[in-house]
């Protein structure tokens, strides 16, 4: 199942709409969970997340380094034709992250990105929290879509965390046997 581009319009983002906007992204996940029930043969979510050229380079590099550290595709299933390189030397990040404790390194990432005045993009957070075995395929610039930086990902449906499975898949399956 392709994870297409998704965008929650500013009108429905929680900071502007209070509780009405709080569940907008959650509803997108409910829809994807429903698709796995309707299409039981679907084995993977495949797609990308986008970061804009205006996003802080240090924050972007930290996020991409972190994702590569925890979700790297060791099989080289898909490679960008023109991979995006980090602007900063990786040695900066090697000392920042422990490398063997996802939760601790995530807290560090979140703190450091916030210290730069940014947040980890919501979809990046959502994908990281969906499956510990997500595969990251690298990042490339899409020169046909405003030079955005797109990072390919793959998530195995059968490896979605139990908490997310119950919330977004099992809940739909119970209501629609």
Regions found by a protein language model. Give the residues of each.
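Non-catalytic substrate-recognition and accessory regions of acyl/acetyltransferase enzymes
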Residues: 1-6, 131, 135, 145, ...
């Amino acid at each position: 199942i392709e994870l297409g581009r998704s965008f929650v319009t500013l009108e429905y983002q929680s900071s502007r709409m209070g509780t009405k906007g709080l569940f907008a992204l959650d509803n997108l996940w409910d829809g994807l969970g429903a698709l796995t029930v309707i299409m039981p043969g679907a084995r993977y979510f495949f797609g990308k997340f986008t970061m804009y050229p205006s996003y802080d380079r240090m924050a972007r590099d930290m996020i991409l380094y972190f994702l590569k550290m925890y979700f790297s595709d060791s099989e080289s299933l898909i490679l960008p034709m023109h991979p995006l390189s980090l602007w900063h030397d990786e040695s900066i990040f090697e000392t920042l992250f422990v490398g063997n404790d996802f939760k601790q390194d995530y807290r560090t990432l979140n703190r450091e990105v916030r210290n730069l005045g940014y947040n980890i993009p919501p979809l990046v957070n959502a994908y990281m929290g969906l499956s510990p075995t997500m595969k990251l395929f690298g990042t490339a610039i899409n020169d046909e879509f405003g030079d955005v930086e797109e990072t390919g990902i793959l998530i195995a449906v059968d490896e979605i965390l139990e908490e997310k499975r119950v919330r977004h898949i099992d809940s739909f399956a119970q209501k629609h046997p």
